């Protein structure tokens, strides 16, 4: 009964972590762009 709960938590966390990484990478890219200008 614990495995479905764990799989649900993992499936819920993966998109959140991916979104967080994408946002941080995008912010760093924009910051580098501004520094280059």
UniProtKB/Swiss-Prot annotation:
GO terms for cellular component: chloroplast thylakoid membrane; cytochrome b6f complex. The chain crosses the membrane at residues 5-25. The 4 large subunits of the cytochrome b6-f complex are cytochrome b6, subunit IV (17 kDa polypeptide, PetD), cytochrome f and the Rieske protein, while the 4 small subunits are PetG, PetL, PetM and PetN. The complex functions as a dimer. Belongs to the PetG family. It comes from Zygnema circumcarinatum. The keyword Ion transport does not apply. GO terms for biological process: cytochrome complex assembly; photosynthesis. Coiled coil: none annotated. This is Cytochrome b6-f complex subunit 5. It is a single-pass membrane protein. Keywords: Chloroplast, Electron transport, Membrane, Photosynthesis, Plastid, Thylakoid, Transmembrane, Transmembrane helix, Transport. GO terms for molecular function: electron transporter, transferring electrons within cytochrome b6/f complex of photosystem II activity. It is found in: Plastid, Chloroplast thylakoid membrane. Component of the cytochrome b6-f complex, which mediates electron transfer between photosystem II (PSII) and photosystem I (PSI), cyclic electron flow around PSI, and state transitions. PetG is required for either the stability or assembly of the cytochrome b6-f complex. It comes from the Eukaryota. InterPro entries: Cyt_6/f_cplx_su5, Cyt_6/f_cplx_su5_sf.
């Amino acid at each position: 009964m614990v495995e479905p709960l764990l799989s649900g938590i993992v499936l819920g966390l993966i998109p959140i972590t991916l979104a967080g990484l994408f946002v941080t990478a995008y912010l760093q890219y924009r910051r580098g762009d501004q520094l280059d200008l």
